[in-house]
């Protein structure tokens, strides 16, 4: 009984103490400024400790788990040996214990990101060679799939003769032929007979060449030169006929310029084809040439005709005629001799704009030979009846137009020659040192004299006039002058 009374009194006292506790500190308020301030300070301290703790933990993880990498580049340098020969030495990294780690993890950490470093920055030459071989193989496969399936041999006929610009013209033609991706035979017909100069020049090409000599010498007039070049081309066709060369015959003059697409286009011809030729009427006097064109435009009140010679087609891509370069505006103003400065005009139909199948020239009769081609046995008789390539066919309308039916110009006709009496070294090869025309302190030939000839020095002195210095002339202008005893000053 006493125990239950004691417990009841204990719980009553405890409940009254809890109820009376707020009244003991009446100044306590949860919304006071001091409590808010301390709450904000507590939050800032928590946030700062969180940031510092994250950063500290990141650094600890970085130092514990990151590997130290040493990047050693092999630096090439030149070292002169005892024999005076430069040798290329390469520095190799030292064999250390960390080499194994370098091979496993070639990574340098900068900030938070890693940079991958190659052991050698330059590509492997063996891999580069394999890549080039793969590209060549791919190009060959593409040509076999999309290009000419069974290409024929290209037979090129070039008439030439020894002159000042022969090396200039033959260099361009030779390098164009060297780039042809098909089998090629180059027939060079030289006027005046075979010379060592021309033979040594065409031998540099490395092509299959047939060097023929022609007895007649090249004349000095353009009209006679066109006729002789026709005979030289027909002489080459006779060789094709006798040797039964199989392929596509094209006529490449030594001064013409050819596009590489031309050699792909002629592979499509079946028997006899024609293409457009750009005519570059050269003239040493540009003002005279422009005046001729203006006069033509003023008379006709139309634009001058395009300087192109080739086939003309209709909307159905069929040959209907020929576009010939109009030479009437240049009447009596064209060059007669080779070394004149007047414009040089082409012949009626240039041979360079035609290609033909070499089987048309064979003596043996072919079953599939077209009937519109003439009997070319006249090649054995003479050259009088043939003036242009169209003389080889009976019906010119059967000629196959090439180059998008003549709309694409794939070669250009140009005639540029030097004076007939101009001097030039044979083959443009200088065997002896040149004469010194301008003295220099250092000359490439120590044995030669560095002084000008006495006659040249006297002529230079006679032509030179004494120069008056600017300061002296200025003083003379500023000095006062006297007129009739009156002294006049230069300044007011």
From Swiss-Prot:
**Highest taxon above the source species:** Eukaryota
TM regions (residue ranges): 34-54
Per UniProt, the ranges with Basic and acidic residues bias are 473-484
Q: What class of enzyme is it?
A: transferase
Kindly state which keywords UniProt assigns to this record, in alphabetical order.
Cell wall biogenesis/degradation, Glycoprotein, Glycosyltransferase, Golgi apparatus, Membrane, Signal-anchor, Transferase, Transmembrane, Transmembrane helix
> Chief localization class?
Golgi
Residue positions with a glycan: 99, 196, 314
Entry's EC annotation: 2.4.2.-
Cellular location(s): Golgi apparatus membrane
Looking up InterPro entries in the UniProt record yields: Glyco_trans_43 (IPR005027), Nucleotide-diphossugar_trans (IPR029044)
GO BP, one annotated term: cell wall organization
Intervals, Lumenal compartment: 55-492
Q: Which parts of the sequence lie on the Cytoplasmic side of the lipid bilayer?
A: 1-33
- Give tissue specificity per the record: Expressed in developing interfascicular fibers and xylem cells in stems and developing secondary xylem in roots.
Gene Ontology CC entries for this record: Golgi apparatus; Golgi membrane
- Where is the segment annotated Disordered? 457-492
Identify its membrane topology class. Single-pass type II membrane protein
Gene Ontology molecular functions: galactosylgalactosylxylosylprotein 3-beta-glucuronosyltransferase activity; xylosyltransferase activity
> Which purpose does this protein serve, as stated in its record?
Involved in the synthesis of the hemicellulose glucuronoxylan, a major component of secondary cell walls. Probably involved in the elongation of glucuronoxylan xylosyl backbone.
User: Which family is this protein grouped under?
Assistant: Belongs to the glycosyltransferase 43 family.
Task: Give the protein's recorded name.
Answer: Probable beta-1,4-xylosyltransferase IRX14H
What does UniProt list as this organism's lineage? Eukaryota, Viridiplantae, Streptophyta, Embryophyta, Tracheophyta
State the encoding gene. Answer: IRX14H
């Amino acid at each position: 009984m006493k125990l239950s009374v004691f417990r009841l009194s204990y719980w009553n006292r405890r409940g009254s103490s809890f109820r009376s506790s707020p009244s003991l500190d009446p100044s306590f308020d949860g919304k006071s400024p001091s409590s808010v301030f301390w709450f904000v300070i507590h939050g800032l301290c928590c946030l700062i400790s969180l940031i510092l703790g994250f950063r500290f933990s990141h650094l600890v993880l970085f130092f514990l788990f990151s590997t130290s990498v040493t990047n050693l580049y092999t630096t090439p340098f030149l070292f002169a040996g005892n024999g005076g020969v430069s040798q290329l030495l390469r520095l190799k990294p030292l064999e250390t214990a960390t080499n194994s780690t370098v091979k496993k993890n070639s990574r340098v950490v900068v900030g938070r990101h890693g940079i991958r470093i190659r052991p050698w920055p330059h590509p492997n030459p063996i891999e580069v060679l394999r890549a080039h071989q793969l590209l060549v193989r791919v190009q060959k496969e593409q040509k076999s799939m999309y290009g000419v399936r069974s290409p024929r041999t290209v037979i090129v006929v070039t008439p030439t003769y020894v002159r000042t610009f022969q090396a200039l013209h033959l260099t361009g033609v030779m390098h164009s032929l060297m780039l042809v991706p098909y089998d090629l035979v180059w027939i060079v017909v030289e006027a005046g007979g075979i010379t060592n100069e021309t033979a040594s020049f065409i031998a540099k090409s490395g092509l299959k060449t047939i060097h023929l000599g022609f007895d007649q010498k090249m004349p000095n007039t353009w009209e006679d030169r066109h006729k002789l070049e026709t005979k030289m081309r027909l002489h080459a066709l006779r060789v094709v006929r006798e040797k039964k060369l199989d392929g596509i015959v094209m006529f490449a003059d030594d001064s013409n310029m050819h596009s590489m697409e031309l050699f792909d286009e002629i592979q499509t011809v079946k028997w006899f084809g024609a293409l457009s030729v750009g005519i570059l009427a050269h003239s040493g006097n540009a003002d005279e040439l422009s005046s001729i064109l203006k006069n033509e435009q003023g008379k006709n009140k139309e634009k001058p005709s395009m300087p192109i010679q080739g086939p003309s087609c209709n909307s159905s891509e069929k040959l209907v005629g020929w576009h010939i370069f109009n030479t009437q505006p240049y009447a009596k103003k064209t060059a007669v001799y080779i070394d004149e400065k007047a414009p040089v005009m082409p012949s009626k139909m240039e041979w360079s704009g035609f290609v033909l199948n070499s089987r048309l020239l064979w003596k043996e009769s072919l079953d599939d030979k077209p009937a519109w081609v003439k009997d070319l046995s006249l090649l054995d008789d003479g050259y009088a009846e043939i003036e242009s390539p169209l003389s080889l066919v009976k019906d010119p309308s059967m000629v196959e137009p090439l180059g998008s039916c003549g709309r694409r110009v794939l070669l250009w006709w140009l005639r540029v020659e030097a004076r007939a009496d101009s001097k030039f070294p044979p083959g443009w090869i200088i065997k002896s040192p040149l004469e010194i025309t301008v003295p220099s302190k250092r000359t490439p030939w120590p044995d030669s004299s560095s002084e000008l000839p006495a006659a040249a020095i006297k002529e230079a002195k006679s032509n030179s006039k004494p120069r008056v210095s600017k300061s002296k002339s200025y003083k003379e202008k500023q000095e006062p002058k006297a007129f009739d005893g009156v002294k006049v000053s230069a300044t007011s």
